């Protein structure tokens, strides 16, 4: 799948789960499971409950996503 097919949405971290998984509440009210992208993992960026993040989602699975950016 091309990168242009991904949906980028903003959300807030609700809960930190094991194995670098997070529950994220999106702006539209939906709650999804998201994991951390490799760049965030490589740079040791901490993600805590309450943080605002940008999540990339596939149009084929709207229940899961990848966290690509954490707002300060």
Curated annotation (Swiss-Prot):
InterPro entries: NA-bd_OB-fold (IPR012340), RNA-binding_domain_S1_IF1 (IPR006196), S1_domain (IPR003029), TIF_IF1 (IPR004368)
One Pfam family hit: eIF-1a
UniProt keyword annotations, A-Z: Cytoplasm, Initiation factor, Protein biosynthesis, RNA-binding, rRNA-binding
MF-aspect GO terms: ribosome binding; rRNA binding; translation initiation factor activity
Residues covered by the S1-like domain: 1-72
Subcellular location: Cytoplasm
Gene Ontology CC annotations of this record: cytosol
Similarity comment text for this entry: Belongs to the IF-1 family.
Assembly behavior: Component of the 30S ribosomal translation pre-initiation complex which assembles on the 30S ribosome in the order IF-2 and IF-3, IF-1 and N-formylmethionyl-tRNA(fMet); mRNA recruitment can occur at any time during PIC assembly.
Described purpose of this protein according to its UniProt entry: One of the essential components for the initiation of protein synthesis. Stabilizes the binding of IF-2 and IF-3 on the 30S subunit to which N-formylmethionyl-tRNA(fMet) subsequently binds. Helps modulate mRNA selection, yielding the 30S pre-initiation complex (PIC). Upon addition of the 50S ribosomal subunit IF-1, IF-2 and IF-3 are released leaving the mature 70S translation initiation complex.
PANTHER family the record matches: TRANSLATION INITIATION FACTOR IF-1, CHLOROPLASTIC (PTHR33370:SF1)
Name of the protein: Translation initiation factor IF-1
Gene name for this UniProt entry: infA
């Amino acid at each position: 799948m091309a990168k242009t097919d991904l949906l980028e949405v903003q959300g807030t971290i609700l809960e930190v789960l094991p194995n670098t998984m997070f529950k994220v509440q999106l702006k539209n009210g939906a709650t999804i499971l998201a994991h951390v992208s490799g760049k965030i993992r490589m740079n040791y960026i901490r993600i805590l409950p309450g943080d605002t993040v940008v999540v990339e989602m596939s149009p084929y699975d709207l229940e899961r996503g990848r966290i690509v950016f954490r707002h300060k």
